Amino acid sequence: PDTDTAETVAERVEAALRRLRLDYVDIFHFHAVRPASYEYHRDVLAPALVRLKEQGKVRHVGITETGPNDPEQKMLAQAIQEHPWEVIMLAYSLLNQGARHGIFPTTMRRGIGTLLMSVVRNIFSNAAYRRATFAKLVEQGRLDASILSDGDPLGFLVAAGAAENITDAAYRYARHEQGVDVVLFGTGDK
């Protein structure tokens, strides 16, 4: 349930600025907003950020999705049509391309900044996991069995020598997508 108020949001931002000894933050995102919570964030919480922006304490107001709870990106599709969102963070990858047609055209038209998360997950960085996942998709009838014939189902991405490995290919793919402003890199060590 949504228990924060505009006042608690403002108080937390002010406290964070004091603790970090900053005058402002460049972007404040409401993170992992579920579709059912969107209107609450927009109508109840976001006005606090707008006031902080007017005071020069927040430069840009943002919102981020929760991919596992909104795989069709319904919340973002609504948010990018409305005030006050100036920047969004969303999941996008070689295997999750819905934003290409559902989100990026609007963000480009409206000048909304985009930060990509989840560009590389285990499916790209772990060959055994990747093969097992694709084998399961073949077993379910969602992919043709020929995808497994050459060993690595995504091996074609490095076959021509353009990318060093699958992870590199996934990052390259994301950074060249029209409508992408920032690609966030993960914190893993593999």
Report the location of each language-model feature.
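Short, charged beta->alpha transition segments
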Residues: 12-20, 49, 76
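Generic alpha-helical secondary-structure signal
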Residues: 12, 28, 169-172
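Beta/alpha (TIM)-barrel catalytic core signal, keyed to glycine-rich beta->alpha loops juxtaposed to Asp/Glu
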Residues: 33-190
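Glycine-rich anion/phosphate-binding loops
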Residues: 3-11
